[in-house]
Amino acid sequence: MMPRGNAMLVGVGGSGRQSLARLASHIAGIGVFVIEITKLYRLIEWRDDMKRLFEITGVSNTPTAFLFNDTQLKEQAFLEDINNILSSGEIPSLYGKDELPAIYDGVRKRAADAESGGTAEELWAFFIESIRSNLHVILAMSQPLCPY
């Protein structure tokens, strides 16, 4: 429930990490965003999903938990992007220059209400701050059983 609050759940397979994350999100009144991995899921689909997640949390200003499972880690770039989200709130080069005006228009009213300013840099900073406040990353990682 805390702004910028994230979680990492580690346990053996079937221990209820994802169920616990969904229950905690429901209790906190936070929606859960889960990506659906298919055989053809690659970096392009990942980036599209991250754009949707950023629009939910940054433009729509909706608190959302991003539940990511270790079995969904198909490419190393996924982990790098999650690291960037956790450290700075953004993924470098996620948006093209042609996509930025729609984001600026989406946050302009809220930024004006918050007296944040109306330049492109100020609107982008407001967008990133909204993402950082509303996005809660939950990593659910498996730990193999120890034979000892």
Give each language-model segment a name.
Residues M1-Y148:
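Conformational switch/transducer regions in large eukaryotic molecular machines and scaffolds
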